[in-house]
């Protein structure tokens, strides 16, 4: 592969530090043999992370992470990706160690700063320290990290770790929405919903518009929320058929909570023909993901013999499992 084509291949995928290295490669083709392999390994590792193949991703990071021929910025990226794989696995102590290593080689690595902010803000791997988390978010935001800006805006809105300032929080979220930030769209819409339904029509339309924008950007939670809106009929005209379509779309997009809504609609015949067998299948999917609504729905089916033989022992067991979980899809949207 020629040096110029190597630049074109990697430039879309990696950050500023990598681009600097690649520019050096263009100037010095002999350097390709020294740097090309680490870059290929890093790109492969990042693609594996997107596919949740985290152990294999870490294998590709070694031994290139120790190569003497890469820049400090590129080495920082290696450590960040390694730390991120541990975060995705819930191994937060290991994640923190790698993220701090990333900052040793590049103190301005915004992704590493942001992830460390998350660990402290939520108390994962470290004792919860919201102030420390916010300090990392501020540093990352200084480098235009949009997710870090979101956390700062959200903290202002709810007063977590800082003095509550709803006006500034909403303004900051609105700025992020203008930049296309999906989580900001969702939280802004949810905030307006939670402030009550005695608002004017303009706010109703804005809530719906925010969810629709988030859905176009690929948010399964937005599809789920739109389904709930049409099921409730409080902000829009009730349309149970359309609600079921949104629940199905949310499930297809990866929403685990959508299965409970689909199952409930099937069991009650809401917007779809009543089908207890199909309802049971979706309740089982939800239960497999430890959602309380899945267990409770199964308990209901077995208690009253809906699509199954009455079995009060099984019903009680499912009710107990549901009571022992903290999540309930029907109450989260």
What are these regions, as identified by a protein language model?
Residues 27-84, 324, 328, 333:
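N-terminal leader/linker segments that initiate helical-solenoid repeat arrays
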Residues 63-64, 81-86, 113, 117-122, ...:
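Hydrophobic face of amphipathic alpha-helices that form TPR/SEL1-like repeat modules
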Residues 67-68, 72-74, 106-108, 122-124, ...:
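Short helix-capping/linker turns of helical repeat alpha-solenoids
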């Amino acid at each position: 592969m020629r040096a110029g084509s190597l630049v074109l291949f990697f430039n879309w995928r990696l950050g500023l530090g990598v681009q600097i290295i690649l520019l050096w490669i263009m100037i010095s083709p002999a350097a390709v043999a020294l740097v090309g392999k680490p870059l290929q390994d890093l790109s492969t590792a990042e693609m594996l992370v997107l596919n949740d193949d985290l152990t294999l991703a870490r294998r590709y990071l070694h031994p290139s992470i120790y190569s003497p021929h890469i820049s400090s910025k590129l080495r920082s990226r290696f450590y960040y990706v390694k730390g991120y794989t541990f975060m995705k696995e819930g191994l937060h102590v290991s994640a923190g160690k790698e993220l701090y290593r990333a900052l040793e080689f590049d103190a301005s690595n915004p992704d590493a700063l942001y992830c460390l902010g998350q660990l402290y803000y939520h108390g994962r791997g470290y004792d919860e320290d919201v102030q420390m988390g916010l300090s990392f978010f501020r540093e990352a935001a200084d480098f235009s990290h949009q997710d870090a800006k979101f956390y700062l805006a959200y903290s202002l809105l709810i007063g977590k770790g800082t003095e509550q300032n709803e006006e500034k929080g909403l303004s900051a979220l609105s700025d992020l929405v203008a930049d296309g930030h999906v989580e900001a769209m969702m939280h802004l819409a949810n905030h307006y919903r939670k402030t009550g339904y005695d608002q004017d029509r303009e706010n109703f339309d804005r809530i719906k518009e925010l969810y629709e924008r988030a859905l176009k950007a690929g948010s399964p939670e937005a599809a789920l929320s739109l389904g709930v809106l049409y099921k409730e009929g409080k902000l829009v005209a009730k349309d149970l058929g359309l609600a079921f379509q949104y629940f199905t779309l949310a499930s297809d997009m990866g929403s685990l909570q959508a299965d409970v809504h689909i199952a409930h609609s099937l069991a009650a015949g809401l917007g779809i023909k009543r089908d207890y067998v199909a309802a049971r299948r979706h309740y089982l999917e939800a239960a497999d993901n430890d959602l309380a609504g899945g267990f409770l729905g199964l308990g209901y089916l077995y208690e009253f013999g809906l699509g199954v033989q009455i079995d009060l022992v099984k019903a009680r067991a499912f009710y107990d499992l549901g009571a022992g979980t903290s999540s309930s899809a029907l109450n989260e949207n």
